[in-house]
A protein has these predicted regions:
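Terminal amphipathic alpha-helical/low-complexity segments used for targeting or macromolecular assembly
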Residues: 1-76, 182-187
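Short linear elements at protein peripheries
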Residues: 56-104, 108
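Left-handed beta-helix
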Residues: 87-88, 92-101, 106-107, 111-113, ...
Length: 187
């Protein structure tokens, strides 16, 4: 999973995040009106400084941004650690979102309130692919989730999910399969 290592990476992540929110550029009033987007902006800057700090001043900036991100996250109900999400993250609403620090999520993930991405069995951490939509109150616990997957409201994902499907229920089952017939094993 790529992380932010250069200023170009930071710009690319911030641009992808803005695009995911449907914004063309960052404006000051988004700090107030788009609180999740503001949180993400701080998170991305915190990731950059944590990954690149080499001087004492850089470590101070990294610590300051980590604290700001933590306090804003607590106000919004987010517990999202650094270096988990790829570019293009979109947090739909404020509300409780908990993500394990060893989870890995690909590009263009849309996440709603009440979502938990955490450890399943001891030592099993989720890996989520690209272009994934996670609906409200869904849980992904130690499972691998493919690309272009929609996790419907209230689903509890504990087993691997293939690409191009929708899952729902407790435990999560495939409710819609968008894969070609050959990929499904049908003739």
């Amino acid at each position: 999973m790529p992380v932010i290592r250069t200023r170009e990476d930071l710009r690319a992540y911030l641009a992808a995040d803005l695009t995911a929110y449907g914004l063309r550029r960052w404006r000051l009033h988004h700090r107030i009106l788009k609180r999740p987007a503001h949180f993400q902006r701080l998170l991305r800057k915190s990731e950059y400084w944590a990954n690149t700090a080499r001087t004492p001043a850089g470590h101070v900036v990294a610590a300051y941004l980590k604290l700001r991100t933590k306090f804003l996250g607590e106000r919004l109900g987010f517990d999202i650690p650094r270096n988990v999400f790829g570019p293009g993250l979109s947090i739909a609403h404020t509300g409780l979102i908990v993500v394990h620090y060893k989870a890995r999520v690909g590009t263009n993930c849309r996440i709603h309130h009440g979502v938990t991405i955490g450890e399943g069995r001891p030592g099993h951490f989720p890996t989520i692919g690209d272009d994934v939509f996670i609906s409200p109150m869904a849980m992904v616990l130690g499972a691998d989730v493919g690309n272009r997957v929609a996790i419907r409201p209230g689903a509890v994902v504990t087993k691997s999910v293939p690409d191009d499907v929708d899952v729902a229920g407790y435990p999560a089952r495939i409710v819609k399969d968008r894969r070609p017939r050959a990929a499904r094993g049908e003739d």
